[in-house]
Amino acid sequence: MIQVQRILGLPVLHENGKFAGKVKDLWFDEFWTPVGVILDRYTRSGLIRKMPRAVYWEDIVHCGEDALLIRNSTVIATIDSKQLLRTFHTGVVRLKDMSVYTIEGRHLGEVSDVYFHPSEGTQILGYELTDGFLADVFEGRRKLFLPESPENIVLGEDAILVPASYERILTRDHTRKVTGEDG
């Protein structure tokens, strides 16, 4: 299982060891399935590229703790920014900080991280929710892992709606150290 916050900022390397860039964001399709990773826009000389670059998830050979490995430079695609509608934290529709509500209107928190399997075409497995910095420090963040076949979940542009019964499956992580943006 992978957490999005853990792969942001990781180096992307070719199988021969050549540096390709760093992970800037995760890109999702309209069903919130991971499509690929967006690379930073900086060149080795510090210049900024005009068009974003991305690597499709199926072209990532391995997603490790400290780096992502890709086959070669041909798998790096230059894409139009308009294609990057749904991302974790930089797109038009951002999953990070999106509010999660039950269908009965109870606020469960905001998304601070997302869990998914590293295999291609995997749906989101769960969310880490925050109630604010102080609640995170004193009580821990809450995790909402989705059932095997999540039904009745609405992944909207402004909020995520879940059945009221999902409130019972929230767990608090009291051991999670909250130190900054990456939690």
Regions from the PLM with identified roles:
Residues 1-183:
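Peripheral interaction segments used for macromolecular assembly
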